[in-house]
From Swiss-Prot:
GO terms for cellular component: cytoplasm. It is found in: Cytoplasm. Pathway: Cell wall biogenesis; peptidoglycan biosynthesis. Cell wall formation. InterPro entries: ATP-grasp (IPR011761), ATP_grasp_subdomain_1 (IPR013815), D-Ala_lig_Van_CS (IPR000291), D_ala_D_ala (IPR005905), Dala_Dala_lig_C (IPR011095), Dala_Dala_lig_N (IPR011127), PreATP-grasp_dom_sf (IPR016185). This is D-alanine--D-alanine ligase. Mg(2+) 2 binds at E269, N271. Pfam families: Dala_Dala_lig_C, Dala_Dala_lig_N. Its EC number is 6.3.2.4. Binds 2 magnesium or manganese ions per subunit. Mg(2+) 1 binds at D252, E269. ATP binds at residues 128-183.
């Protein structure tokens, strides 16, 4: 049977462009190895014209950040009638807004950290909540703009009010959750497993930890009790379903193992466009579940649809 023509969308114009190019080229190489006819599309503002001319059978969305994972390009693909991978317009927009995604997760009974959304200029010189807390852009990924305010710091970081800040006006101020960094991948209605992320030389899972070779160590499967492991799997699937995700998603958690039972589990966010670089988590978790990179991507292509 003739393999499909797949347009791999990558690059774009968000702050996550380099990550997207890495993801996109990794995916394109693997899909070509699987026998698909692949067109690599470095996305610009005329992407609708480019896709109209290419006429692909499927658009594989390897974009990250605004435009690529906030429902915008998904809307373009729906308008053009091109089947595409990952989540649809509504789920993508919802998951991209960390505050709205937390609201939905909480309503579904998923434990989340207390937080509030503010304009960054409101923060000024006074702590918006008792340290320790985390300040993060409401709609960015790859840990761009994440600032941890520790106990003992006399005032919030000055960068929040400076011209150097390039991550939008709305920020989420969230209670800092100590403990272990865990993540869980979901593929359709199947949970693939839980992985622990151990940053190497960094205090938390920041941009360098995520994408620099050797920046972090992935312990897959996570070395936690079976009860906690299974609970995190159930919560990740519940978040995937509550937000309306399709294809592959990845939920991030903190787990404070000093607390009794399941009390230390806190859901942080869901990623509807998880990275697919050589150092990314979802390919590692899938491999532990017996699914190779090429097989994972082939499943995503065959799962593509329009509408989503």
């Amino acid at each position: 049977m003739k393999k499909k023509h797949v347009a791999v969308l990558m690059g774009g114009f968000s702050s996550e462009r380099p990550v997207s190019l890495s993801s996109g080229n990794s995916c394109a190489d693997a899909l070509e190895a699987e026998g698909y006819r692949v067109s690599r599309v470095d996305v610009s503002r005329d992407v609708s014209r480019v896709l109209s001319e290419l006429k692909p059978d499927v658009a594989f969305n390897a974009l990250h950040g605004p435009f690529g994972e906030d429902g915008t390009v998904q809307g373009v693909l729906e308008y053009l009638g091109i089947p595409y991978t990952h989540s649809g317009v509504l789920a993508s927009a919802l998951a991209m807004d960390k505050d709205l995604a937390k609201t939905v997760a909480k309503s579904a009974g998923i434990p989340v950290a207390s937080s509030r959304v503010m304009n960054r200029f409101e923060i000024g010189d006074k702590h918006p909540m008792e340290p320790p807390y985390v300040v993060k852009p409401v709609a960015e990924g790859s840990s761009f703009g994440v600032v941890i305010v520790r106990e003992g710091q006399s005032h919030p970081p000055q960068v929040l009010g400076s011209a150097e800040w390039g991550y939008g006006e709305r920020v989420m101020v969230e209670r800092y959750i100590p403990g272990r960094e865990l993540t869980c991948a979901v593929m359709g209605d199947r949970v693939l497993g839980v992985c622990e992320i151990v940053p190497v030389g960094h205090s938390f899972y920041d941009y360098d930890s995520k994408y620099a070779p050797g920046g972090s160590r992935h312990v897959c499967p996570a070395e936690i009790s079976p009860n906690i492991y299974q609970k995190i799997e159930r919560l990740a699937l519940k978040a995937h379903q509550a937000i309306g995700c399709r294809g592959v998603s990845r939920s991030d958690f903190r787990y404070d193992d000093r607390l009794p039972g399941e009390e230390g589990i806190v859901w942080l966010e869901i990623n509807t466009q998880p990275g697919m670089t050589p150092t990314s988590l979802v390919p590692d978790i899938a491999a532990q579940a017996g699914i190779g990179f090429g097989a994972l991507l082939s499943w995503m292509v065959e799962d593509a649809s329009c509408p989503r």
